[in-house]
């Protein structure tokens, strides 16, 4: 394995860059110097990281949607609507699925079909197909900072074009945009691809341009125990920092139990800072993002607003720097811009109401946070051991050994032995720990928590609990109880 968690040399980077820029015609004449020069013209109020840092200092929680359509003018119209009618503090450009798979020719077909039909035939904005100038038109046409949000195992060309195009934040990571999204991508390959992305961001940083980087916290978004997502976030933060990234936002997807959600965010902040400092990255600016519920939603819009508001409440009580907002159309598919704006306003109402409240030092939160820390430390110590001190190599071996195991992930790399279920209060525990390197005390803790639920429901701890929990929120509950349970 050639993989190492070491900063790419300039020779290695620029040799690879020639190949990357040649993969689609919009990369052909792309100039790194021009991209840096253009980024330097973007004022502080349009810089993603600066707005996050200000919010963190003021202990505010900013709102951000997901959004993206095929045609530039329609995309601009959508973003403008979300920042005016939706009152979004931060804006996205969600990238289409063809771009995520580097199938740019099919993206071109989608653009043409969108023009013919008068509606978006792509599920996002095809930034690579359009190239730098149109990206600059998009980012300069709105008032707020814009982030690239996608799901791309190999995002090298996308990074090149969007950074030169004026986007000031880039989401994703080698693990979080592989394991939950892809079946066949080798982890060592996505590791090297994302080292390129992070090294490019590092080069902008070294030239005086700070680009925010955000690993994708929720992973599969389905009953992911906090220790798994937190461990992945720390590894991806370390890998980004090694390549020169100095502005990182670590994230987490809502599980639904308020104590556990606040504790997860608390422990994530502590652990990310601890590991960055330990490896000499004390100059990395660290912020957080909380994703509202990523699982099944109720079809009824009024009930969906309840789920959205609960996510906003958890985010602000955990003092997350920003919250990624859902819409009341979540159960139906891609929302209208009006529905997207409604989800944003509902979230804004809650974050504004609760902005002066802080649950992070609540005694129950601290206890749960300590448990999550212990679990994450078990995983990270094993990863470090497997990699002989190298977290990139260790992550590859860690997945192979099941020391990191993401529930319900499609990837062949993922062992899939660790299985989650909710305890009697709705916190996510492990019904099967698989090969996770937990202590006996931690294994006992999870077993006892689930046995407590089983006693309440008068049934054994079994796989049916998992199935019931997956569908519960869509049916109006957090814990998937059998009918007749009091």
Residue ranges and their predicted role:
Residues 103-113, 185-194, 265-269, 331-360:
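C-terminal helical cap(s) of enzyme catalytic domains, especially alpha/beta-barrels
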């Amino acid at each position: 394995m050639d993989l190492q968690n070491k900063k790419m040399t300039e020779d290695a980077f620029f040799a690879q860059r020639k190949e990357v820029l040649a993969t689609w015609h919009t990369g052909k004449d792309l100039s790194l110097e021009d991209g840096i020069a253009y980024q330097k013209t973007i004022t502080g109020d349009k810089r993603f990281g600066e707005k996050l840092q200000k919010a963190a200092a003021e202990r505010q929680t900013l709102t951000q949607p997901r959004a993206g359509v095929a045609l530039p003018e329609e995309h601009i119209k959508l973003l403008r609507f979300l920042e005016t009618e939706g009152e979004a503090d931060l804006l996205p450009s969600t990238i289409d699925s063809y771009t995520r798979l580097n199938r740019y020719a099919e993206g071109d077909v989608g653009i043409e079909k969108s023009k013919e039909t008068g509606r978006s035939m792509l599920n996002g904005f095809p930034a690579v197909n359009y190239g730098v100038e149109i990206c600059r038109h998009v980012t300069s046409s709105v008032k707020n900072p814009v982030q690239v949000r996608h799901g791309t195992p190999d995002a090298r060309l996308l990074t090149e074009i969007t950074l030169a195009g004026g986007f000031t934040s880039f989401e994703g990571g080698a693990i979080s945009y592989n394991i939950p999204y892809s079946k066949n991508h080798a982890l060592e390959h996505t590791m090297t691809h994302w080292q390129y992305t992070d090294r490019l961001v590092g080069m902008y940083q070294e030239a005086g341009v700070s680009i925010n980087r955000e690993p994708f916290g929720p992973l599969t978004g389905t009953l992911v125990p906090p220790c798994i997502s937190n461990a992945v976030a720390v590894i991806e933060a370390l890998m980004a920092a090694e390549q020169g990234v100095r502005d990182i936002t670590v994230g987490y997807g809502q599980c639904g139990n308020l104590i556990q959600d606040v504790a997860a965010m608390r422990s994530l902040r502590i652990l990310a800072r601890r590991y960055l400092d330990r490896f000499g990255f004390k100059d990395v600016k660290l912020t957080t993002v909380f994703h509202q519920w990523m699982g099944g939603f109720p079809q009824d819009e009024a009930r969906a607003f309840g789920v959205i508001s609960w996510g906003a409440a958890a985010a602000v009580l955990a003092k997350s720097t920003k919250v990624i907002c859902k819409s009341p159309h979540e159960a139906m598919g891609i929302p209208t811009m009006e529905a997207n704006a409604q989800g944003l306003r509902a979230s804004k109402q809650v974050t504004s109401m609760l902005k002066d409240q802080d649950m992070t030092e609540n005694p129950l939160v601290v206890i749960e946070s300590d448990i999550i820390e212990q679990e994450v430390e078990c995983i990270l110590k094993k990863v470090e051991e497997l990699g002989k001190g190298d977290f990139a190599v260790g992550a590859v071996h860690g997945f192979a050994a099941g020391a990191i195991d993401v529930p319900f992930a499609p990837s062949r790399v993922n062992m899939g032995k660790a299985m989650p279920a909710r305890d009697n209060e709705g916190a996510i525990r492990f019904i099967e720990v698989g090969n996770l390197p937990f202590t006996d005390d931690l294994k006992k803790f999870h077993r006892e928590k689930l046995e407590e639920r089983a006693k309440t429901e008068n049934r054994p701890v079994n796989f049916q609990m998992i199935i019931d929990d997956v569908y519960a929120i869509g049916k109006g509950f957090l814990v998937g109880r059998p009918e007749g349970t009091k």
